[in-house]
Amino acid sequence: MRIRQMTSDDLAVVMRWAAGEGWNPGTRDGEFLAIPDPAGLLVAEKAGDLVGSIGMLRFGARFAFAGLYIVRPDHRGGTTGARLALAALEHAGDRIIGTDGVLERIADYEALGFRGAHLHHRHSGAPTPATDPRVRPLAHGDVDVVVGLDDDCFPGDRRGFMRAWLDGDHLVRCWAPDGGQVTGFGVARRAVAGWRIGPLVAPHAGAAEAIVRDLAAALPGEELHLDVITGNPEAVAVATALGMTPGFACVRMYRNGTPQLPLARMWGACTLEAG
């Protein structure tokens, strides 16, 4: 068995694995995961066959994020997962590393030095749509501000990633009260099932709820999925007020230290595969 960098074809296979695990990735997520650190996208190959994957994406000199950690079911219980993890940790070096660990594997992450910070709890539903004069679509002049808001809430440098995330067919809504400065935003993207929302950044609960309802108004009849950041004590209440019900949960974990983030402004994670 060898560990090597993914090709674009490999990444397409891995994203299908992620869908098969019930993670419901965005339909174009693979394109974006290749932006920050292609060398960190790794697969395990045995006799020419892909048997496992991991992504260890380096976001600048101080932070990396691990995701897409999958071993094909018929190869579980052996050394594939451990070899992938060790290769990924070597790629990250001494950076703080974040990951979202599935609940049944927390002990494995702890054995690698990760410690839990809070839950990311997926909530799903079709919120009652409502437009709000304080919420508007992203304008060209908003991009730098929105990228800056995201940068404040992420422990590494993903500005290039975020500029791409705001482009294309993703739906973006901005919180700009009284037509003034943008102080919050939410991004929705088509997923295998419904639409995923993330990141969701807002100055308070009312703004977070208004952004999601405005996104719902632009996506009539669609089911929306939000990975609620429970480190923000008001976030679950907002999801409940939106009529969304809890489902899949994972633990945000860190290795080599825990970054200090403005969790009170963070309502929904961008993507569990890249932070």
Report each predicted region and the residues it spans:
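Residue-level "edge-of-site" marker
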Residues: 31, 102, 122, 252
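Non-membrane alpha-helical segments in proteins
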Residues: 68-70
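Internal alpha/beta loop-helix hairpins
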Residues: 103-118
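Short Pro/Gly-enriched coil loops immediately N-terminal to beta-strands
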Residues: 115-123, 245-251
